[in-house]
Structures are given as C-alpha cells and as structure tokens.
C-alpha cells in the first residue's frame, strides 16, 4: 500500500496548483454550509463521476471543512501520478489483503480529529446524473471502527454548463443522522436519500 508522504515544498506547490486548476476550469464553485465538529474527524462519502472528483473535494475541504485532506485512490493511479501521495492520497488494491490494509489505514487516519478522509464506495465511475447509487460493502469496515470518533458526511457533486463556456460546480453536503449501519443496504439507502434530494434540487435550476 502507498501511504501519504510529507514534503512541505511539494505540498505547497501542488496545493496552489489544485486551487488554480479549479478556479481556471470552472466558472463557479458552490456548496452549502454545514456545521462541522472540530473535535471529530470527517469521513466524506461522495458520488464518483469524473477525473475531477478528487480535486473538487480537495477544494471543498479547503473552503469548508479545513481538515487535513486524505483520499483513497486506486493503487495504479497513485503510482502513475507522483504528486498525489504528497496531497494526502493513499492507495487501495483490489486484492483482498490490500483492500483490508487500506480500509484499516483509513480507520486509523480517522482516529485523529484533524483528519478528513474521502472514500468512493461506488468503486467505479458512473454518470453524473445516475438515478440509483450502489456501494461496495468495504466502507462499513471503516465506519464500524470509527463511529464514535468521526462525523459521516455525504456529498453529491453536479457539474453543468447551461449557457456558459465553462461549467459550474455545485456540491451538496449533509451530515448523516447516524454513524452506525447494520449492513451496506442501510448505508446505501441513507446516501441515496441525500443524493436524490440533491439531484432534484440541481435539476430544478433554470436559467
């Protein structure tokens, strides 16, 4: 497993790079404010639809959560893009041993209230406006190990152009009412309710 590395110079450079990348490529970046407990870490569960996802959530953390950013990414991606590990990325492998190691590492990170961890339970890329969201069950291992120490936050991101040359980003976030789920179906349903409400709100935008 590839874990995050510390290098202040590299981190500073690519922090500025990511912020500029978002500002340059999107005409707007909108999100709703929610109360965040400073004494608890954040487990952020988003939808997964594009190459931009990690950068968008990094930007969201910078603007809203203000925690130390970490994100679980496929091992081949972390290996290929050298700077990701300096920006909080850690790898996950699809083999069972590597999978458990990465999930346990995510749980360890969440023991620190200053940390935020992003996990994409969908596991694959889907359409930005897919109706039904399905999760892999591995995320439950992280939640079960950290439910008293972290706050579970759902996010749903939508990108649209309307009449503009550049698209706008809308991120809808909501804190889960509970941090314990008996099975993956309960977690998926809880996220689905947030996602559907966000999708309906997004599709009601008329220019």
Residue ranges of model-derived segments:
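Alpha-helical membrane-targeting segments
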Residues: 1-26, 79-87
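Helix-to-loop junction immediately C-terminal to a conserved catalytic motif
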Residues: 12-48
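Glycine-rich, highly charged phosphate/nucleotide-binding loops
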Residues: 25-30, 97-105
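Flexible, charged surface loops at secondary-structure boundaries
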Residues: 34-39, 65-66, 110-113
